[in-house]
């Protein structure tokens, strides 16, 4: 794990980079404040190069990432996990270019990182009301889903 201050438009975060041993992908983790007993505001987001970096309107235009930083800054403490994806999260074939889907392995990576940070009870930033299962095995509990 590498760590460094990260000044952003939303304030000064701490940036940690976790490297996945099986595939070498490097996952970015932005934290604001220190975890405590209160539930922590968390966003786990898959890499979306065309939306996050190039603001492609058909690819989410980075809105969820910016909204997540805004929400964490407003709350005063929280965590954003940016899960790296092969090919920047894109799938390209004869049918065109589209975003790949986040799968169970990506949730597992995010959960391992959150557990390593010492989080237990989280307020998950999401617009997807479906229940995320399997986090209990990492000692995590979603106490609230927060739309952005």
Question: How would you name each of these model-derived features?
Answer:
Residues 1-148:
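Catalytic domains of riboflavin
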């Amino acid at each position: 794990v590498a760590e460094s201050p990260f000044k952003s438009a939303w304030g000064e975060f701490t940036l940690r980079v976790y490297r996945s041993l099986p595939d070498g992908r490097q996952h970015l983790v932005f934290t604001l404040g220190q975890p405590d007993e209160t539930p922590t505001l968390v966003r786990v987001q898959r890499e979306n190069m065309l939306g996050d970096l190039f603001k492609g309107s058909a690819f989410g235009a980075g809105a969820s990432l910016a909204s997540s930083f805004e929400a964490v800054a407003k709350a005063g403490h929280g965590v954003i996990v940016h899960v790296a994806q092969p090919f920047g999260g894109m799938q390209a074939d004869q049918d065109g270019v589209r975003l790949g889907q986040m799968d169970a392995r990506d949730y597992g990576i995010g959960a391992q990182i959150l557990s390593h940070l010492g989080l237990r009870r989280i307020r998950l930033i999401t617009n997807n009301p479906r229940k995320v299962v399997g986090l209990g095995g990492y000692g995590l509990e979603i106490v609230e889903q927060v739309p952005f």
